[in-house]
């Protein structure tokens, strides 16, 4: 089952999410928006199992990578379900 994986421009290009993903959903691609010159990309979302290890590994305060498992997950992540 695939899930929606969003990469935000707060990504610092550290590769932590890529290394944490057990199914190789993520990869780094060139990007001029940060010092590292790269940003995470999710070309293989059909392989995402929803483990959210990428989110846990992300060192940014804004969780630059997010995995949305469905409608409830999306509203919860926005703080709307509480």
UniProtKB/Swiss-Prot annotation:
Residues bound to [4Fe-4S] cluster 1: 11, 14, 17, 58
Annotated SUPFAM superfamilies: 4Fe-4S ferredoxins (SSF54862)
Annotated residues for binding of [4Fe-4S] cluster 2: 21, 48, 51, 54
Pfam families, alphabetized: Fer4_7
Keyword Transport on entry: yes
An example Gene Ontology molecular-function term: metal ion binding
GO BP annotations, alphabetical order: photosynthetic electron transport in photosystem I
Cofactor note: Binds 2 [4Fe-4S] clusters. Cluster 2 is most probably the spectroscopically characterized electron acceptor FA and cluster 1 is most probably FB.
Keywords of the record: 4Fe-4S, Chloroplast, Electron transport, Iron, Iron-sulfur, Membrane, Metal-binding, Oxidoreductase, Photosynthesis, Photosystem I, Plastid, Repeat, Thylakoid, Transport
Domain (4Fe-4S ferredoxin-type): residue spans on this chain: 2-31, 37-68
EC number(s) reported in the record: 1.97.1.12
Catalyzed chemical reaction(s): reduced [plastocyanin] + hnu + oxidized [2Fe-2S]-[ferredoxin] = oxidized [plastocyanin] + reduced [2Fe-2S]-[ferredoxin]
NCBIfam families associated with the record: PS_I_psaC (TIGR03048)
Self-association and partners: The eukaryotic PSI reaction center is composed of at least 11 subunits.
Stated role: Apoprotein for the two 4Fe-4S centers FA and FB of photosystem I (PSI); essential for photochemical activity. FB is the terminal electron acceptor of PSI, donating electrons to ferredoxin. The C-terminus interacts with PsaA/B/D and helps assemble the protein into the PSI complex. Required for binding of PsaD and PsaE to PSI. PSI is a plastocyanin/cytochrome c6-ferredoxin oxidoreductase, converting photonic excitation into a charge separation, which transfers an electron from the donor P700 chlorophyll pair to the spectroscopically characterized acceptors A0, A1, FX, FA and FB in turn.
Stated name of the protein: Photosystem I iron-sulfur center
Species this chain originates from: Trieres chinensis (Marine centric diatom)
